[in-house]
Amino acid sequence: NYYTREVYEGVGNNDRHKWVDESLPFTEMGWEVYPQGLTDILLQLNKQYTLPPVYITENGAAMADTYADGQVQDTDRIEYFQGHLQAVSDAAEQGVDIRGYFAWSLMDNFEWAEGYEKRFGIVYVDYETQQRTIKASGLAYRDFISSRHLAKSA
């Protein structure tokens, strides 16, 4: 599973301080969007341990989804997936045996720490009616899966 990186710097006496790059975009969870971190950790682990086949079983982002006119135009989530899928591709090109990638999550759901407040899904769920609507990110993910090629971001 990979969602973001965390970088800490020592500040003396065994204390540490979390370092955050404010120039990066952030998710609704307050996490940096840093796809290069996924490439970096895969390459580092493969160099150190010679990894067996790898499956990325969870990768996704809670974003500020707005349901309007029967649609959710979540371009920030599309960009998140494009960046992270490219990161996986980059690691594979450099020798990591990656066999699978799974977006988190198919549908907006109950998150153990956030309840229904944060939406990770590529399918929007109206919690009152249970109506489901495929988000723009769901359509983009479908297109990637069917073509096995990343669309270039605008």
Each model region followed by its residue ranges:
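Non-catalytic scaffold segments within catalytic domains of secreted glycoside hydrolases
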Residues: 1-154
